Amino acid sequence: MTALPRYAVFGNPVAHSKSPQIHQQFTLQEGVDIEYGRICADIDGFAQAVSTFFETGGCGANVTVPFKQEAFALADEHSDRALAAGAVNTLILLKNGKLRGDNTDGIGLVNDITQVKNIAIEGKTILLLGAGGAVRGVIPVLKEHRPARIVIANRTHAKAEELARLFGIEAVPMADLNGGFDIIINGTSGGLSGQLPAVNPEIFRSCRLAYDMVYGDAAQTFLNFAQSNGAAEVSDGLGMLVGQAAASYHIWRGFTPDIRPVIEYMKAL
C-alpha cells in the first residue's frame, strides 16, 4: 500500500490550529487523501523537527508562530513574496532535495477582502495597525493591488517608521490618526488579552471595512469597538486563514481550492 502524501503545520503552541480541518476540506474538493498533522516543535528545536519531517517522507509544511523567521532562514530558496516579507509560512520539498519557502499570508488576506467580501483595494486608503511579522507579511501583496495610500501605525512608532521606509508607505503615530480610511486592518496581538489599539474611535467613522487578522474570540474586542464607532462592516481573520492555507495547498499540489465553502464550514464548527 502506497503511503499517503504527508503535510503538517509547525508551531508552538499548535494544538489549537485549525489547519488540519481546513486542509481536509481541500482534499474533499480535490478528491484525494493526504495526511496532515500538527507538530509542536521545541522553541530551540524547529530546524531539527523540520529536517526530520522531510527526511521521513514529508512533502510540505505550514509554519506558524513563532517560527516564521526561522523557516525563512532554513529555506534554500525563497519566493519574491517571502523575500519581501522576511518570513516563511509555507515550505515545500523540491525534487532536487532543496526546501523552498513562500509566504501566503498576504494572498490570504487580499483574497478574503477582494473575492469573498467583494471590496476593492485599488484606489482605497488603508490603515495597518501594528508593525510585527503579521503586518510585514501582508504589505507586499496589498501594494500589488494599488491602493491610493497605505498608512501604518504602531504603539512603538519607530517600528512603524522602519516598515514605512522599507516598503515606501507612510507611518503616522497612533495618537495622530484622525480618519479618512476605507479599510482598517488590525495586525496587533492585543486582542488575545482583550486590549485595544490606542486609537481615536473617530477613525472608524468613514471606514468601509474593519478587519482583524486573528480569528474567533480574540478578534471580538477590536471588531466590537470598530462597529460601535461607525465601521460599515467588520470581519475577523478566518477568511485570511483559509485563504493562506488554500494558497499553500496550491503550491504543494497544483490544485486551487474554492475557499468560500470552507470558510462557511469552519464558521459552523
From Swiss-Prot:
Organism listed in the record: Neisseria polysaccharea
One GO process term, biological-process aspect: amino acid biosynthetic process
Protein's recorded name: Shikimate dehydrogenase (NADP(+))
MF-aspect GO terms: NADP binding; shikimate 3-dehydrogenase (NADP+) activity
Biological role: Involved in the biosynthesis of the chorismate, which leads to the biosynthesis of aromatic amino acids. Catalyzes the reversible NADPH linked reduction of 3-dehydroshikimate (DHSA) to yield shikimate (SA).
Ranges that cross the membrane: none
Gene symbol of the encoding locus: aroE
Chemical reaction(s) catalysed: shikimate + NADP(+) = 3-dehydroshikimate + NADPH + H(+)
A Pfam short name: Shikimate_DH
Catalytic center residues: K68 (proton acceptor)
